[in-house]
Every structure is written in structure tokens, then in C-alpha cells.
Design a protein with these regions (language model features):
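Metal-dependent nucleic-acid phosphoesterase active-site entry motif
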Residues: 1-18
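PIN/NYN-family metal-dependent endoribonuclease catalytic core
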Residues: 6, 22-50
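A secondary-structure boundary/capping signal
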Residues: 7-8, 37-38, 107, 126-127
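Alpha-helix capping/helix-boundary segments
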Residues: 10-11, 41, 110-111
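Conserved beta-strand segments of alpha/beta enzyme cores
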Residues: 34, 70-72, 123
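Extended, non-globular alpha-helical segments
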Residues: 39-66, 126, 133-139
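Active-site neighborhoods of divalent-metal-dependent phosphate/nucleic-acid chemistry enzymes
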Residues: 70-104, 109, 113
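Acidic, PIN/NYN-like endoribonuclease modules and their adjacent C-terminal/linker elements
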Residues: 90, 109-139
Length: 139
């Protein structure tokens, strides 16, 4: 089991049963991976889900995350402020570092700064790369 932080856009892309990335969402419910979240991340998930779907669907998805035994709730005590171009993205980085996460899954290039820093064991990957990793470990 790996600890993973999933940015909001990647969460949205992985939820639909018709999504090519659905295996990522499923991996948080079958115990393949642990989804690491903070209250701030959950609030952003809910805000965006409310915009893209409706209140009932957003609540259902958030409740599924919160009640999932493979979700780890992280309390961040230090703000690393590594992303200057979009400071709101720092909540995902801070969560990943605090949680000792293996991956941040994102399509956002603001996170490239993490690739330039030497964080042992933390990789920033896109959906396609993470899906390939999942398919490899499920063989």
C-alpha cells in the first residue's frame, strides 16, 4: 500500500465509472493505495464537485472518502510554501510531505518545483504515469 495525494483535477477525472482513470479511484477503496487528505483538501474537493455536479453528488463522494478505511487524515503543522506560482496548491504538497506520501498525482505543472527539490521517496506524476504504475502492481 502506498500513500498518495491526489490533486482535485485528478480526483474529478478518476471518479466516473467510464473514465480511463477509474482504476485510480478504485485503488483507494480496495486497499491498493491510501488516500492522504487534509480538511483543506476535502474542502476544495467538495467546492469543485459542487460546481461540476450537484450538492447531493458532491456530498456522496466526500462521504465515501471520509468513511473509507483507506483514507488517512493528515494534520499539517508546517507550511513549506514550495509552490510560488499557485500558493493554493501548497496544501497538497504540505499534505504529501507530512504524510510521507509516495506520490502526488497531478497534471498541474506548478508542481514541477517538487521534481527539482530532493524529497526522498516523493514523486510527482501525472494520471497516465500513475495508472501505469497501478497496472504494473496489479499483475
Amino acid at each position: 500500500m502506498g500513500r498518495i495525494v491526489l490533486d482535485t483535477n485528478c480526483l474529478i477525472q478518476s471518479i466516473s465509472p467510464r473514465s480511463p482513470y477509474r482504476r485510480i479511484w478504485d485503488s483507494f477503496f480496495d486497499g491498493t493505495n491510501l488516500l492522504c487528505v487534509t480538511t483543506s483538501i476535502l474542502n476544495e474537493y467538495e467546492e469543485i464537485l459542487n460546481l461540476l455536479t450537484n450538492e447531493e453528488t458532491a456530498k456522496y463522494i466526500i462521504d465515501a472518502i471520509v468513511s473509507n478505511p483507506y483514507t488517512i487524515f493528515i494534520t499539517v503543522y508546517f507550511d513549506f510554501n514550495l509552490i510560488q506560482k499557485d500558493p493554493d496548491d501548497n496544501k497538497f504538497v504540505d499534505c504529501a510531505i507530512t504524510a510521507g506520501a509516495r506520490y502526488i498525482v497531478t497534471e498541474d505543472h506548478h508542481y514541477d518545483v517538487i521534481k527539482w527539490k530532493e524529497f526522498p521517496g516523493l514523486d510527482v506524476v501525472g494520471l497516465d504515469e500513475f495508472l501505469k504504475h497501478l497496472l504494473k502492481i496489479s499483475l
